[in-house]
Amino acid sequence: MLRQLSPHHFLRIAFFALLGIYLAVGLPHLGKFQTADEDLWFANPEEGRVHQYWDAWRHHAWEETRINDKPGVTTAILSGMFGPLYDRHPSDKLKDNDFIVTSAHPAYFKEASFFYRIGIYLANGALIWLIGWLLWRITRNPWLSFFAAAFLFLSPILIGVSQLVNPDATLWSFGTASLLAYVAFVLHGRWRYAILSGALLGMTLLSKYTGAILFFLLYLTAFASLLFLHADTSRETFRRIGIMNILGYLLVLLLSLAVFALLMPAALIDPRYLWEGTFGFKGAANTTPVLALMGGILLAFLSELIFLKARLSHTAMHALRYLKTPLLIAIACIITAGVAFTLLSWSDGNRFGFETAPFDTSRGSEYTSIQGFWNQLALQTKPLVFTTPPAVLLFALLGWLLGAIPALRKHALSNKHQHAVVFLLFLLGSLIILFFYAAFEQHILVHVRYSILLYPAVAIAAAIGAALALHTLPKRHTWMRWGFASILLLWSALSLAADRPFHFNYTNDLLPRNDDVTGAWGYGGYEAAQFLNTRFFSEYALAWSDYEGFCPFFHGRCIKGSIVKWYKGGDFKDIDYFVASRRGLIRNESIWRKLKRDVVHPEPIWTLYIGGRPGNFVEVYKKREPL
């Protein structure tokens, strides 16, 4: 029966099963946390960026559609699809607050959080399906599409980020789909894929300016496809495809700009916003000469195709066609060596004695003051390597290594389809290398959110590796292939249980427990509030929290962060409980030192180590009893 199952039926059944797991894992937690900056998006039910965007459309206040410099419009659109339907009369669900002390309505906030998050979560589930379908159109390999969907649906980090009301939540999904749609275009030459890629790229740029990296990657795709896919064609065919690739690239750019401007009309009123959200993205000052060079090459190449009938370019590509395998081998070696170097550096402590910096320091002096390429590289690659499930990491490396060896990939794939797979591996590897190069150029230490575009790239490479490995098994023994797939999926799914329900804090077991690459960022606040809510007279208690995530779920009164210094002139003896976390204590170090000295009991009454890592903690203290 399994042998008779067609690829289409298999993909359909597999998709719904994986989608069911994705929904079952993620939906129950949507209303049980608040993370960094979400209060700026929707936590206040009468204002915030989501409300600002939808109100701007309602009142035709077009300038107000620019809600943030990210710009986060895609996030606001998806979050606002269900949130405002729930917030019919938000003011009726608030308690009285003042500048310092707030009182929340936990039941309301929990339900509102669910509605503001579910649109993003469902959209990303649909986009994972689209990614799987595009991979099927590109490779015609049902197993590859299945493994890709599985690794994406079962990724703790991607599930976690999809639960957030944050621009990064939609960056990875729209960006990956846009890239694959353009790959489908250069492979099949159908304009509908270019149109789809342009629309998706527009949504990517509306998510976050980091999506501008796709300008460079799609540019590379347009040219590299001529080498990897079309170098052996006739000169006339090569010329036709070359012109189509360039025009398709320009169409994608124009459509992305049109989508950007139409969904953020502020860009039509002030074109500066259009520039800053696309080509003039943050840090673009260093890339202006590169953009000019890219434009010059594009114009020169198009002129050669039109006026010289591709005599030079076809001859050059035909001569360079033997570089395809060396290029992929080079990328495979760079990535494999990078992963091995990262594992050697950190999996058994700081083996090489590198200088360290907090993973969330970004452009902080703790990182920028570090000298030495290898030290910086070890810090840059650490989050990606140690927050990727081991099964995915292993098969991603296997994908690049097996794909780089012609004899091995020919055994698993037909000649026609192996060219598409090799090209995909080249692009995915190029994205990773280009991303880290840009991070070095920007002097910024990337963490999980900053590098979110890389996780689907690694997952797709892992799917290629799994498909290549599976095709080495005898085709007549269907049970062996299904057994291999089941074991691999079970291994991957175990990662979901590791840090559940705090999926965005997932860290694999390759990193020692006393080390961290992620922070709570509001996780654990709900659990701390649930603990205090069960204590006697909690509704009359006053608590202080050093970070987001606690106050909205606490039944009593609450003070957050540094604002406590304004409470009764710095007299803290009325505060009953204190909620502390790693990130919060860094931000409120001096205040916490004063609180510990004056009023806080030395031992916590409740502790949560997220992922079993003591460095990623949430603790609750009570006030010290007077002597």
Which positions does each model-derived feature cover?
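Catalytic lumenal/periplasmic loop and adjoining terminal transmembrane helix
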Residues: G26-K32, T75-A76, L255-F260, P265-A284, ...
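Transmembrane-helix motifs of polytopic, lipid-linked glycan transferases
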Residues: F114, I118-T139, A177, A181
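Hydrophobic/aromatic-rich transmembrane helices and adjacent perimembrane loops
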Residues: V161, D168-L171, T204, I213, ...
